């Protein structure tokens, strides 16, 4: 709902003065090219956004020792994984990037993903050097810092990237409706041109 309000407000600003125009179906906006990255997956292979070209990519930022919102977000993604059926892994790919690279090694991320029912053929849990993670997080609008308790406060932003590598929509927080995200992903699948 928050995302829809942002999108509709932006669209209204773009098409002001067209009150007499025929209604059109709502298309997802194009924010711009998705920032490139190459990071290390749970199986220790390097994964780049370019490797995923041709698929809809849903990108989240998490850390494995988080005890509240990260598990909720990961559970939502696991539910979407199931609902996508045959499109998952074939046409849709999930990426979860840690904001705690010092603790979240590939092995730790693999255990976290497995505990949440991730199907690794379509879901990569990525880590990297602290500098790599800072760079990727910054370019996606993610801010994070370690607290005195050892937790990490960070922005919750889920980014949806189309098969051409364009950033199409971002969801703030974790209270978004999974069905809304699913519909946006399916909309992008319908927009994808066969190669």
Task: Label each residue range with its predicted role.
Residues 1-11:
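N-terminal export leaders
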Residues 9-19:
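Hydrophobic h-region of N-terminal signal peptides that target proteins for export
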Residues 58-59, 94, 158:
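Hydrophobic beta-strand anchors of alpha/beta hydrolase catalytic cores
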Residues 72-136:
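Structural microenvironment flanking redox-active thiols in thiol-disulfide oxidoreductases
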């Amino acid at each position: 709902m928050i995302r829809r309000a942002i999108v509709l407000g932006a669209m209204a600003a773009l098409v002001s003065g067209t009150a007499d125009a025929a209604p059109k179906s709502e298309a997802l906006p194009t924010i711009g090219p998705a920032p490139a990255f190459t990071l290390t997956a749970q199986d220790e292979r390097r994964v780049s956004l370019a490797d995923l070209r041709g698929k809809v990519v849903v990108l989240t930022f998490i850390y494995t020792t988080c005890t509240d919102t990260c598990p909720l977000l990961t559970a939502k993604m696991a539910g979407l994984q199931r609902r996508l059926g045959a499109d998952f892994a074939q046409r849709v790919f999930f990426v979860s990037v840690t904001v705690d690279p010092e603790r979240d090694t590939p092995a730790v991320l693999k255990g976290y993903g497995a505990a949440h029912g991730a199907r690794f053929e379509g879901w990569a849990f990525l880590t990297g050097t602290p500098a790599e993670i800072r760079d990727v997080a910054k370019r996606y609008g993610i801010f994070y810092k370690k607290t005195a308790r050892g937790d990490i406060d960070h922005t919750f932003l889920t980014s949806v990237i189309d098969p051409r590598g364009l950033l199409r929509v971002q969801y703030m927080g974790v209270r978004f409706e999974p069905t809304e995200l699913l519909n946006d992903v399916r909309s992008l699948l319908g927009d994808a041109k066969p190669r």
